[in-house]
Amino acid sequence: MAKPIRKIGLRKGKRKIPKGVIHIQASFNNTIVTVTDIRGQVVSWSSAGACGFKGTRKSTPFAAQTAAENAIRTLIDQGMKQAEVMISGPGPGRETALRAIRRSGVVLSFVRDVTPMPHNGCRPPKKRRV
């Protein structure tokens, strides 16, 4: 299970941020949720690893949900009412993290998938033989 997260004080102090951008980076190994303001300054962030999950448990949907809830807890304290969501990566936690953000009460103006797609660039890794 996830360890209880200790409250970390803000370095810059409280500031009112009415609108922001939530970036979800879902890889196969971890899920990172970063909250920025409109200019791109990071307000808060969380990841499955920072929430106390280790090893293969970091790549679970539940770990992604916990990371999203932790990142959003700080921005609600700072008064964020509206947000845009940018989802990147093919990981298993992308849908669950988005669901956790929707439940938080922040109004989402749009959800955009910004996963980089190659136009036949690098050769992909070989298939695993287990």
UniProtKB/Swiss-Prot annotation:
Top-level division of the source organism's lineage: Eukaryota
Keyword Plastid appears in the UniProt entry: yes
UniProt xrefs under PROSITE patterns: RIBOSOMAL_S11
Extent of the signal sequence: none
InterPro entries xref list: Ribosomal_uS11 (IPR001971), Ribosomal_uS11_bac-type (IPR019981), Ribosomal_uS11_CS (IPR018102), Ribosomal_uS11_sf (IPR036967)
Coiled coil: none
UniProt xrefs under Pfam families: Ribosomal_S11 (PF00411)
Keyword set, alphabetical order: Chloroplast, Plastid, Ribonucleoprotein, Ribosomal protein, RNA-binding, rRNA-binding
GO cellular-component term (any): ribosome
Subcellular locations according to the entry: Plastid, Chloroplast
Gene Ontology biological-process entries: translation
GO molecular function, one term: structural constituent of ribosome
Entry-linked NCBIfam families: PRK05309.1 (NF003698), uS11_bact (TIGR03632)
Complexes and interactors: Part of the 30S ribosomal subunit.
Family: Belongs to the universal ribosomal protein uS11 family.
UniProt-recorded name of the protein: Small ribosomal subunit protein uS11c
Protein species of origin: Angiopteris evecta
Name of the gene encoding the protein in the UniProt record: rps11
